[in-house]
From Swiss-Prot:
GO biological process: protein transport
Protein's gene: SOP4
Signal sequence, start to end: 1-16
Name recorded for this polypeptide: Protein SOP4
Keyword match Transmembrane: yes
Topological domains annotated Lumenal: 17-183
GO cellular component, one term: endoplasmic reticulum membrane
Glycosylation sites: N48, N79
Length: 231
């Protein structure tokens, strides 16, 4: 008798399991082996539940990008609803949607549960119902025959190694001068004015002597004029 009861309970548990089929669409690109390794997919149970919550990870099964989450613990009782959160991420692409609320609703014994999907938003991962309107209503997605996840664009390059000490040309006053074309022009002008007399003296000493003589004569004339006015 106990064996029959145990077998009946086991069949009830098996009957209360379902599968969610999904697909990653990177068209027009083909999914490569690198995409298989650098794409992460996770599904976990949210909302009211008893016992251990469901949590599973999936990998891409084929070059078409198909993946699935199997043995989801759901109830076949009519009007019973179980919620799961699907999180998709990639090291190379920004995926859309990257958060999906999965709703599995029982339809009674002998009938497959109804699977619905809603595009979730950041900060609402643990809200167990799409009917919560704050801050916005969730957009329903096509879940049959499979939920499709695509990509927006390539993700920005990530700096896995960041130098703690940057050089003087990367930060500080000198970096500010090199980044601004106006400051750079002012510095070049000042340096040119400082170097001009030395360059002229080196390449044209006769002109330099003439300039010095002219300055000396102007100084003598100035002092001579001052002496005559005092006398």
């Amino acid at each position: 008798m106990r064996a029959l009861l145990l077998a009946f309970q086991l069949l009830s548990v098996v009957a209360a399991l379902t599968t969610v089929n999904c697909r990653l669409d990177l068209s027009p690109r083909q999914i490569s082996r690198k995409d298989l390794l650098r794409t992460h997919l996770r599904l976990y149970q949210v909302g009211n539940f008893s016992g251990q919550p469901y949590s599973a990870k999936a990998t891409l099964r084929d070059p078409e990008g198909r993946f699935r989450f199997e043995d989801l613990p759901v109830s076949h009782d009519e009007n019973s609803t179980v919620y799961f959160q699907l999180v998709a991420s990639s090291q190379d692409y920004n995926l859309k949607p990257n958060r999906v609320l999965i709703e599995v609703q029982g339809r009674g014994e002998g009938k497959e549960p109804t699977v619905r999907a809603f595009q979730n938003v950041f900060g609402r991962e643990h809200f167990p119902s799409p009917e919560i309107l704050y801050p916005e209503q969730l957009v329903e997605l096509e879940a049959e025959p499979e939920l499709v996840i695509s990509y927006v664009h390539a993700a920005p390059m990530r700096n896995y190694i960041v130098s703690r000490r940057s050089g003087i040309l990367d930060s500080g006053p000198l970096a500010g001068i090199f980044r601004s074309k106006y400051k750079m022009a002012a510095v070049v002008t000042i340096i040119a004015l400082l170097l001009f007399p030395m360059l002229v003296e080196k390449f044209d000493p006769a002109t330099v002597e003439a300039i010095k003589e002219q300055r000396l004569s102007q100084t003598r004339e100035k002092y001579a004029a001052v002496g005559e006015s005092n006398s």
